[in-house]
Amino acid sequence: MAAMAVGGAGGSRVSSGRDLNCVPEIADTLGAVAKQGFDFLCMPVFHPRFKREFTQEPAKSRPGPQTRSDLLLSGRDWNTLIVGKLSPWIRPDSKVEKIRRNSEAAMLQELNFGAYLGLPAFLLPLNQEDNTNLARVLTNHIHTGHHSSMFWMRVPLVAPEDLRDDIIENAPTSHTEEYSGEEKTWMWWHNFRTLCDYSKRIAVALEIGADLPSNHVIDRWLGEPIKAAILPTSIFLTNKKGFPVLSKMHQRLIFRLLKLEVQFIITGTNHHSEKEFCSYLQYLEYLSQNRPPPNAYELFAKGYEDYLQSPLQPLMDNLESQTYEVFEKDPIKYSQYQQAIYKCLLDRVPEEEKDTNIQVLMVLGAGRGPLVNASLRAAKQADRRIKLYAVEKNPNAVVTLENWQFEEWGSQVTVVSSDMREWVAPEKADIIVSELLGSFADNELSPESLDGAQHFLKDDGVSIPGEYTSFLAPISSSKLYNEVRACREKDRDPEAQFEMPYVVRLHNFHQLSAPQPCFTFSHPNRDPMIDNNRYCTLEFPVEVNTVLHGFAGYFETVLYQDITLSIRPETHSPGMFSWFPILFPIKQPITVREGQTICVRFWRCSNSKKVWYEWAVTAPVCSAIHNPTGRSYTIGL
């Protein structure tokens, strides 16, 4: 039987299904489809023309089986190789009550039979604006059974009437719908999944036509939970050798869908009759193998896509060995630090003083020693003399530092087992070097740590980094909204999980506007009264109808002069993977109309024991203030 099944887009191989409207002999058809290389079959569970009557006699009591026996296939085949399809005559949102009632009963009958068979997924059409009753019937079905099927909503990328050739150009058309053109089908989907309360079991099967909408519409779809892409054979062109191919625009869309690991469903008859039907599938395989290779960041992040992690608290907690190990593997970060220290040493020590002027360097938060090694390499590269202090509060990491010193560094490095804020330094430093930044710059309390340590920096001393800025951007992602919603803990407030940030490799999301700077900190901080509390207001113009689920956070830092590190997408340091972005969720999704502005307020607050963020949306509508008094999330000092 087929090598793989529904839900298994494993490795680089394309997972694909064949869509058929009529299957006279199910076992034979399944065998033939598997032979062509497909992994599953989409087919009606009942005969598509067999309309059942649920209210009127005598048809209501018609004898005989309603559909064919489940014994035609093994349980395993039903479970893995068949995706059910709803009969095309079922219209639960019909304005005619008799049709509506009959459709409801027939739909439940088909869904229940699909659950009885244990189908992995069921395809349901979304092909009009009003799908409210469809949503109700499906939601009730999901909440009553113990089945685990996924429900794939078949949504066209462009509404069928937008492709009509019979509309006279520039003539007024009768528009009854609120949204026209490219917006339409996304609004059908958005309203439907909102009615279904963002159920994790409802996903998109996106039907791709010959005409593609504009890029921003496609971008928005890619923030949705797309599980399948339906490709009609009619959209394929023919190359010189008679094989089916896709246009360049379609190829670009396929590449982006492959990144989301969607499964492809081929529908329609063979339009390239001299070629085997499997040539459509072979072309998709060809595209998969010839897509741009993943970069170093994507390779490192594999498996972490949209996986929520709690931000580290290295001040309050001692990190584990593996955590240090991951950070030390970053090839870019430490070469940038080395370059910054190198430039700083050259600026501070003129050539004629290179043998007499010994610069005192203090690595604050030395961890297992990567910055100490970067400093030693920089001194060698600059041909300047340095004296090093490696200060680390984690007693476990100090063991590693002391071994380094014993085996490699010698008397050039002094290892100090102490919190930098409490250490009484024997002398003042020319340069302090630290790597205390989190995904949102200051969220691992770099400002508080460095402010507490700057009393042992000389008046003309330098801090590396010298400055850092956090950035925020509004995003839409039902995947991430659902992931956050699922983080509910039984002893906490039911919405506490929406009042804390998460470190996450953003993947299945749509950024609604470019990131804007939020908070900036500079070191050394020479203000007479140091206050690291902050408040900012950011306004983001939005050019599409969409829904806001939260904010992505990034940072940029100036290590020294023109040497920088960044995880802001526009300026991301190539190949650097030490930091994933941070996510600040909001409790309730907010619908945003094209042309509106999203206004967010962000606070950085603190008391003597902890630091926390608070945030609120104030336009286009007001949200609650999230995390007041740090009730759900704080960072311990």
Swiss-Prot record:
Catalytic activity from the UniProt record: L-arginyl-[protein] + 2 S-adenosyl-L-methionine = N(omega),N(omega)'-dimethyl-L-arginyl-[protein] + 2 S-adenosyl-L-homocysteine + 2 H(+)
Localization of this protein: Cytoplasm; Nucleus; Golgi apparatus
Main location class: cytoplasm
Segments for region (Beta barrel): 465-637
Enzyme's top EC category: transferase
Source organism: Bos taurus (Bovine)
Activity control mechanisms: Activity is increased by EGF, HGF, FGF1 or FGF2 treatments, and slightly decreased by NGF treatment.
Annotated spans, Dimerization: 488-494
Domain SAM-dependent MTase PRMT-type: 308-615
Modified residues (N-acetylalanine): 2
Official protein name in the record: Protein arginine N-methyltransferase 5
TM region positions: none
GO biological process terms, semicolon-separated: circadian regulation of gene expression; DNA-templated transcription termination; endothelial cell activation; Golgi ribbon formation; peptidyl-arginine methylation; regulation of DNA-templated transcription; spliceosomal snRNP assembly
Classification via InterPro entries: Arg_MeTrfase, Arg_MeTrfase_PRMT5, PRMT5, PRMT5_C, PRMT5_TIM, SAM-dependent_MTases_sf
Binding site for a protein: 327, 435, 444
PROSITE patterns in alphabetical order: SAM_MT_PRMT
Residues bound to S-adenosyl-L-methionine: 324, 333-334, 392, 419-420
Record flagged with keyword Transferase: yes
Record gene name: PRMT5
Positions of the catalytic residues: 435 (proton donor/acceptor), 444 (proton donor/acceptor)
